[in-house]
From Swiss-Prot:
Localisation per UniProt entry: Secreted
Name of the protein in question: Conotoxin Ts-011
Domain of life: Eukaryota
Keywords from the UniProt entry: Amidation, Disulfide bond, Neurotoxin, Secreted, Signal, Toxin
Record organism: Conus tessulatus
Distribution of this protein across tissues and organs: Expressed by the venom duct.
Record-stated family: Belongs to the conotoxin T superfamily.
Length: 64
């Protein structure tokens, strides 16, 4: 057996590579997108609700 099969070589290479996440996660690690996600969603919903409510009597409608 002069040469190892290709799958065995690939498995050895994959096993020897470092992990993508080399630093352990802590409780303070929060992705930037989810940090302000709830605030942005609430602000958008509040704006849409206000537009819907005030457009009925046309006193403060910004659309059309």
């Amino acid at each position: 057996m002069h040469c190892l099969p290709v799958p065995v070589i690939l498995l050895l290479l994959i096993a020897s590579t470092p992990s993508v996440d080399a630093r352990p996660k802590t409780k303070d690690d929060v992705p930037p997108a989810s940090f302000h996600g709830a605030d942005n969603a609430n602000r958008i919903l509040r704006t849409l609700w206000n537009l819907r409510g005030c457009c009925e009597d046309k006193t403060c409608c910004f659309i059309g």
